[in-house]
């Protein structure tokens, strides 16, 4: 494993102050306040509070299907890249996850009903079963305590000839990611890069093997993240149009969020590439307010494997039924002709 650190436009001594400033800027509308606000905002998001939520379930179920297909399709080496990697591995039994309780509306009910030894294990749709199997490999005791993020899912399914590149700009998370990855048996195939994944991705494409899977999933704390996703993907497709690209996004009452899938669809159609769009909403209980956290999210995949739509069509009804909280729950799935 190699860990590469890129210089940040702020001094290390200022990090603690940036955490405080980041919270203030977010409340004030940081997206209008320039580069310093952007840096502070990036430092304020910690995925450890959200690990294993319904958004992770959607994203990681699709990721497992795609990775398994690509690994089996050809022996040619595959480049895997995650633009916003986080720490790679999370503990659901520790304070961050316990405080938010988001896994209780995500992976935990699925694990209890369809995980190892559960009554419904044999009836789990193939995509859901494969996803839970990856989690089980990290939780030999049968209790779901450790949750592998996208980097660890990719590491679990990659082959000896594949390479994994992980971008993480957050100073604390990048150090934790480096430490977590170092303990993997295939760590020599993985490179941790402390850099902005939107820009860092450019140096990787096109890969020498002409095969790549790229996951783009920023926190979207800033409105500018949506435009950066589109710009990043447009640049990536100009460099390597045949790669498989997964974009995750939150479904929230913000114009940029509503426009994003339409912009991605237009981008794929202009390039003549196939696409798939899936959303999952757990709805909202009668006693829950509009401030009770994220209720829905979506993924947009360019150049998806042909099996992905069918696998999600089987899995999403089961996932939605298990996780639904009330009014507004549902799922949608559409793909290119």
Model regions: which residues?
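Class I S-adenosyl-L-methionine-dependent methyltransferase catalytic core
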Residues: 35, 39-337
